[in-house]
């Protein structure tokens, strides 16, 4: 029977693989590279140690960032002046600059950025 730490590590690894599939859906080259890097990191920390819970937490945080904060842009390969199209999926975190809080205070925007 596997230990709780091993089960947590497997769960984190699976979440990381799912996050790479979502974040890099149409970019096979980048998705494979990200998965190879995840595998390399998990293999290098195969033995359980003092920092294992921190490593598992790090993997979960990376998966969360990949899933909620990474947006890929594409444009036509032949046209350098083509507009970029962003692939925004349902899990992407959305917000605007007016909702950012600084030191617990709401930021008030008085003028447009181009002014």
Swiss-Prot record:
Q: Which domain of life is it from?
A: Eukaryota
List, alphabetically, the CDD domains matched.
Complex1_LYR_LYRM7
Subcellular localization, per the record?
Answer: Mitochondrion matrix
Tell me, which GO biological process terms does this entry list? mitochondrial respiratory chain complex III assembly
Transit peptide feature, positions: 1-36
Q: Which UniProt keywords apply?
A: Chaperone, Mitochondrion, Transit peptide
Provide a GO CC annotation, any one.
mitochondrial matrix
Chief site of localization: mitochondrion
**GO molecular function list:** protein folding chaperone
Describe the subunit structure: Interacts with RIP1.
Q: Spell out the family assignment given in the record's similarity comment.
A: Belongs to the complex I LYR family. MZM1 subfamily.
Role summary: Assembly factor required for Rieske Fe-S protein RIP1 incorporation into the cytochrome b-c1 (CIII) complex. Functions as a chaperone, binding to this subunit within the mitochondrial matrix and stabilizing it prior to its translocation and insertion into the late CIII dimeric intermediate within the mitochondrial inner membrane. Modulates the mitochondrial matrix zinc pool.
Q: Which PANTHER family match?
A: COMPLEX III ASSEMBLY FACTOR LYRM7 (PTHR46749:SF1)
Its protein name is: Mitochondrial zinc maintenance protein 1, mitochondrial
